[in-house]
Amino acid sequence: MWVRTTLRIERWTKEKTEDDTSSWDESSTDINRLPSWGRGHLLASVESSTDASTLSSEGEFKNTDRCCWKHKCAGHIVRPFSPDCVHHDVHLHSLSHCDCDSRLKDCSEKTNSSSGDVGPTCSRDVDSTCFDIIQSPCFELIPEEECVERFWYGWCKSYRPVSVAVIHHPIHHECGADDLNQEEEEEEEEESKPPIPTQVGPTPTDSPTDTGMSMITGAPDSAAPITIWRSESPTGKSQGNRVIKKIKKKKEKDKEEETDEKEKAKVKKKVKKGKLMKKKSPVKSESPPDLSRSLSPRELARMSESSPDSRQDLESEDSYNDPGREEPSSEDIVESSSPRKREKNGVQVKKPGLKTSPVKKINKRRSPPASNPNLS
């Protein structure tokens, strides 16, 4: 049942559109077939009635009425607040194809050119309200594919071509009356502009012997006086050139002086930086001199004998080197051990919290004990 109803609707719409196109042909000149509701809403100034039998009853604006009706009966129209061609019209006015809008514009221009009146006509008012004031956009149709059948898992099985409406900006109508108004405004502006003042030449009263610069005023054409500076001397041009050359030379000298000052300042900055670097450079710590080279062997021996351990080492080395030398006696050993005890006692007496500066003790080298002849 659903398929039959859809077929009937399509058939009815096709028959209706065919009847409309056959009845409203562009070559037809009779406008009485237009319904009253259609003619009344086209133009407010056009008097429409159901009893109209001739074209003369429509008045002077029958051509404009015909242009508007052709535009209204166009095939591709998107009604207000209705979706069509995959586009939902939200405007209060309907949207038509861009080709239909261009035809309406051409038709209105033809009616304006055919009319003998120079002033504004009804067609101009209609075009300005439709395109400039309301700014009704137009659309173009682009073919795209739409899915007709789908598989059970969601993929599309077959497609069909669908026309999609793409909206464009409205076409601005350039009315002939606007051009006339612009020309009138330009003429008014030219008239309101003040006349251009002309230069006044030198008066005959001026003496040719005067040299230098002189001001000449003549009969003023406008409110403000015009001043002209001139030099009457034959060498006036050469003098002016000399002055210009002097000024150029002064400027060049000033530039050279500025560059010299900048270079000097840069050199001074570099010198100051070099001095600061020298001051900041760390002082090299002098290495302690090699005592073994500067001191004599006797002084080295004395330094080594300052500690009792080194003394014992020296004595052991001497005994090893000199086999004929006798061993030290017990008294000497006791005497040598006594300074150790003294040092230990001195360390115990010192307080633990205080730091004492190290004191180097230098002991004189004692002569070795003489050999006793009686013992031998």
From Swiss-Prot:
Polar residues bias locations: 230-241
One MF term in the entry's GO annotations: phospholipase A2 activity
Residues covered by region (Disordered): 180-376
Acidic residues biased stretches: 180-191
Bias (Basic residues): 243-252, 265-282
Any one GO biological process: phospholipid metabolic process
Residues bearing PTM Phosphoserine: 319, 329-330, 367, 376
Alphabetical list of Pfam families matching this protein: Phospholip_A2_2 (PF05826)
Keywords: Phosphoprotein
Ranges of Low complexity composition bias in the record: 202-211, 284-298
Domain of life, source organism: Eukaryota
InterPro entries, per database record: PLipase_A2_dom, PLipase_A2_dom_sf
Compositionally biased spans, kind Basic and acidic residues: 253-264
Family according to the record: Belongs to the PROCA1 family.
PANTHER family the record matches: RH14732P (PTHR12253)
Protein name: Protein PROCA1
Species of provenance: Bos taurus
Gene name tied to this protein: PROCA1
